[in-house]
């Protein structure tokens, strides 16, 4: 039973990372493919299309990394501030903190006597850990790493973004838009199904949802490209 529980905990962590990776790759695919399609629809030559796509890849990856770094850093700062405050309160008012932990367990369904016993034993073993986990909701096993999160976010975005760029290099010059659109939609369907499967949702529904928005984004940028291409 303990082996199953241990496996389930690690599976939850892996699913979280998988979903984040899929979302990053989706962002890279949709944004870069849409940019490539829009520039190609404007009648630009292959070198111009590739330069625009590569610039979009770099800008998007850096933006994702910066956003993830700021987000995770802010979360980490908030958690550390909460833990520091809890440490001070445990030092200054230990009885009040024990009462607070007891009320927390009573609210979860334990009777007051048992809740007091649990709170007392956990406090004797690791008071800060008990309060961090059960009062603040900060799991002991989950630690946010801003730099790691930023690198993963940038890398997954770049992996998705490089797909339409490769197709733009290999496709016939006159059919770059078509080849990029078809390849991107197929890749989005696969990623959408993978993300849905990781989250326990229906694979077909997840694939169609992502594919629809990808198609809409590329259609919108193609329309803009054609409009400005005609005007020019």
Feature map (PLM): residue ranges:
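Interfacial loop-to-transmembrane junctions
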Residues: 190-215
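The feature identifies polytopic integral membrane transport proteins across all domains of life
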Residues: 13-24, 46-54, 114, 146-151, ...
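Core segments of transmembrane alpha-helices
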Residues: 28-33, 153-163
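Cytosol/matrix-facing amphipathic helices and coiled-coil assembly/linker segments
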Residues: 1-20, 72-154
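Internal alpha-helical transmembrane segments
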Residues: 1-71
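Juxtamembrane boundary at the C-terminal end of a transmembrane helix
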Residues: 222-232
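Structural signature of hydrophobic alpha-helical transmembrane segments
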Residues: 174-187
């Amino acid at each position: 039973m303990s082996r199953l529980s241990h496996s389930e905990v690690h599976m939850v962590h892996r699913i979280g990372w998988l979903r984040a990776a899929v979302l990053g790759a989706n962002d890279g695919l949709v944004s870069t493919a849409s940019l490539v399609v829009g520039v190609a629809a404007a009648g630009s030559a292959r070198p111009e299309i590739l330069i625009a796509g590569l610039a979009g890849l770099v800008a998007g990856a850096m933006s994702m990394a910066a956003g993830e770094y700021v987000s995770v850093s802010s979360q980490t700062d908030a958690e550390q501030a909460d833990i520091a405050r809890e440490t001070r309160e445990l030092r200054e008012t230990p009885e009040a903190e024990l009462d607070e932990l007891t009320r927390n367990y009573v609210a979860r369904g334990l009777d007051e006597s048992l809740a007091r016993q649990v709170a007392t034993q956990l406090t004797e073993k690791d008071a800060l850990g008990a309060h961090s986990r059960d009062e603040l909701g900060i799991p002991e096993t989950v630690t946010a790493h801003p730099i790691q999160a930023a690198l993963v976010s940038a890398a997954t975005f770049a992996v998705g973004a490089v797909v339409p760029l490769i197709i733009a290099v290999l496709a016939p010059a006159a059919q770059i838009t078509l080849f990029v659109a078809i390849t991107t939609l197929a890749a989005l369907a696969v990623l959408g199904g993978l993300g849905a499967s990781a989250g326990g949702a229906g694979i077909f529904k997840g694939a169609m949802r992502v594919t629809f928005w990808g198609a809409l984004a590329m259609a919108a940028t193609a329309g803009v490209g054609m409009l400005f291409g005609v005007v020019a």
